[in-house]
Amino acid sequence: MAPRPRPGQLMLDEIREQPLVLERLWREEGAAVRALARRLRARRPPAVVLAARGTSDNAALYGRYLIETRLGIPVSLAAPSVVTLYGARVRWRGMVAIGLSQSGRSPDIVRFIEATRDAGALTVAITNSPRAPLARAADEVLVLHAGRERSVAATKTYTAQLTMLSLLVAHTAEDRRLIRAHEALPDAVASALETVPAVTDAAAHLSQASECLVTSRGYNFATALEAALKLKESSRMVAEALSSADLLHGPIAVVERDFPVIVVAPRGRALGHLSGVLRRLLRRRARTVVLSSVPRLLASAAVPVRLPDVQEEALSPHVYIVPLQLLAYHTARLRGLDPDRPQGLRKVTYVL
């Protein structure tokens, strides 16, 4: 009988596995992604709807930003209850509906994809389980090839979902620069794994706090949401994610001396705004953890987490989430918790 893993070992192993997962996805599913991209270009859908829950819902939000900015197609994030609770018949004909679920067994997502397919949408499943109900419900299936994810906290399937979405959009847009930029992702994610000394410093501060804020903007708003979710799941911390734009519309009032705020600030269109938000947080004496490659931002942080420059801003979420996954792990361990077995959680949640 194999020995029981140490607390959190499954989560840590799966975080470390991510560079190999992204390489395998590119290799195994590239042809399927290109074929679906051709079908999407031919279809020219007037809109896309993305259906997901939990971590997958954060990946879906990233997909919304990417599809709207790179393809110019309006995107809706699904409210599955419209179908499963209210039985509404929505006019989906001609549109594209994408369901994201690592297990492929979330009943409300499966039912939503079935309803959109029956209403005339082209349906796509993005899942780690090619034989799951979601895959059977969809017209097209993209498989994550992430291997079994044993920890309750999803890590490697999240970055795989981000990569699947960015590859699909890059090929649909026939954006050669964005396509080529994916080749550097495994190495960039491997570099992000080397942030452990800074991350453990941040965890030492967070483990003593009862709450924190996580903020970013644009593509990395999804990163902030996923980081907050991981801290809640693994560390039992009241972590709230806010767009840095929304943070200024009132919530910044809760920030006082030594209040922990995590700022995700890669180079890109949102950097100027995030720099201004960081200055305001510093004036309020917040204890800031800053993830960036920009020296002047890192120099102002209580805990700087230096990351490599990412060639394409649109791919920075794939890299910037990695130290935040590590942060959730280390914070949980410092609190004496097992992030592989969060209290009251299961790997698959059944909601209809």
PLM features: residue spans?
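Hydrophobic membrane-spanning alpha-helices of multi-pass integral membrane proteins
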Residues: F259-R267, Y320-I321
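Generic C-terminus detector
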Residues: R4, Q311-L352
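Glycine-rich phosphate-binding loops that contact phosphosugars or nucleotide phosphates
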Residues: R41-D187, R217, I252, V264-V310, ...
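Active-site phosphate/pyrophosphate-binding segments
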Residues: R6-L10, E14-P45, V49, E140-P260, ...
